[in-house]
């Protein structure tokens, strides 16, 4: 079991015009051969939308129950979304549905689920360092922690490794993304790590519960 509720709630910021997205998804890697014949290796279950840490904890048990029922994972969108921008994007999608009725289903599938991703709040964005399975090597992981320590990143467990999360603005003690990227590149080169084993990501979902 992987439970990141307590860590993630401390990363949330309160803004009356914004909300966070939680997606519950089945992953093929959690089902051995059951997904082998499917074209898509992920299956969407449902979304939750919360405005603050209290709302997140209020639905915690519901999220856990659904994950257990479907052997699914709950993912949390690190960057908050703007309510007005979401409504504006939804109007655009619905207009496309009316104008292109013959392609309505394709338009819906392609665009509707992606609406929140286009409607960021515009505040300081969160970035995270994705560390994959090979870093279960304790000595290597501790070496990486030492390299990342100056950036004061929050450490969050993942199914195959760990994530280090921080804000991307330089002011007020937030991280310098360019410097962080250079640090990761140097570490990869020195330790012969592949790019996908150690990545700097943005606007991504992070595992809330599994």
Mark where each language-model region is.
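Signature for HUH/AEP ssDNA processing cores
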Residues: 1-159, 169, 178, 204-210
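A generic structural motif
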Residues: 152-161, 193-199
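C-terminal polymerase-core module
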Residues: 186-210
């Amino acid at each position: 079991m992987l439970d990141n509720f307590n860590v993630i709630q401390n990363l949330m910021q309160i803004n009356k015009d914004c909300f966070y997205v939680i997606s519950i998804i089945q992953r093929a890697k959690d089902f051995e051969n059951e997904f082998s014949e499917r074209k898509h290796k992920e299956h969407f279950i449902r979304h939750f939308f919360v405005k603050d840490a209290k709302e997140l904890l209020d639905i915690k048990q519901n999220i856990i129950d659904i994950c257990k029922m479907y052997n699914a994972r709950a993912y949390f969108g690190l960057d908050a979304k703007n309510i007005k921008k979401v409504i504006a994007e939804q109007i655009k999608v619905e207009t496309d549905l009316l104008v292109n009725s013959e392609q309505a289903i394709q338009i819906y599938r392609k665009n509707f689920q992606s609406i929140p991703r286009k409607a960021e709040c515009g505040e300081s964005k969160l970035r995270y360092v994705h560390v994959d399975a090979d870093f279960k090597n304790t000595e290597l992981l501790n070496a990486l922690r030492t390299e990342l320590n100056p950036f004061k990143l929050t450490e969050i467990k993942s199914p195959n490794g760990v994530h280090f999360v921080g804000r991307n603005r330089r002011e007020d003690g937030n991280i310098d993304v360019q410097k962080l990227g250079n640090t990761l590149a140097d570490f990869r080169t020195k330790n012969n790590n592949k790019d996908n084993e150690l990545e700097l990501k943005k606007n991504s979902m992070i595992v809330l519960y599994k």
